[in-house]
Design a protein with these regions (language model features):
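Conserved catalytic or regulatory cores that recognize and/or transform ribose-phosphate-containing ligands
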Residues: 1-134
Length: 134
């Protein structure tokens, strides 16, 4: 079983915190040089991985990960996992951003995708799913 680690980049360390907790394979799309080949590989892995995870943190500068998460929650809800971390190395969302993100979480949850609030909860779920026979 494998998971695509999508979501906030911008020197956010959530992936560094989550990866040691995982007992499954993963694809980390973060690269030093974002090329057309890297983009193609990311799209391929989003399709191939058993789960696609989107972790959103206050270090987010663009909104495309939110679009991807919403799209995947519509097209592949059983494979989509979404999480909003409200603090990232001292950075926090504004109250207005939090309201929008809460609405996004509700939309994704209503699409029957999984929504978690902590990296530990994500790891527990993925590790459990890794033990379940296909």
């Amino acid at each position: 079983m494998d998971v695509f680690l999508g979501g906030t980049c911008n020197n956010s360390e959530w992936r560094d915190e989550l990866i040691p907790l995982l007992n499954c394979d993963y694809f980390n799309p973060v690269v030093d040089d974002w090329t057309e080949d890297a983009q193609k590989l990311e799209l391929q892995k989003r399709i191939e991985c058993d789960f696609v995870l989107y972790v959103i943190t206050p270090k987010m500068t663009g909104v495309y990960s939110l679009v991807e998460a919403t799209d995947d929650s519509n097209k592949r809800p059983q494979r989509t996992i979404f999480c909003v971390l409200t603090n990232d190395d001292g950075n926090e969302f504004t109250e207005s951003q939090l309201k929008s993100l809460e609405m996004t979480k509700n939309l994704i949850r209503n699409n029957n995708a999984r929504v978690f609030d902590t990296l530990q909860d994500i790891a527990s779920f993925l590790n459990y799913m890794n033990l379940v026979p296909n």
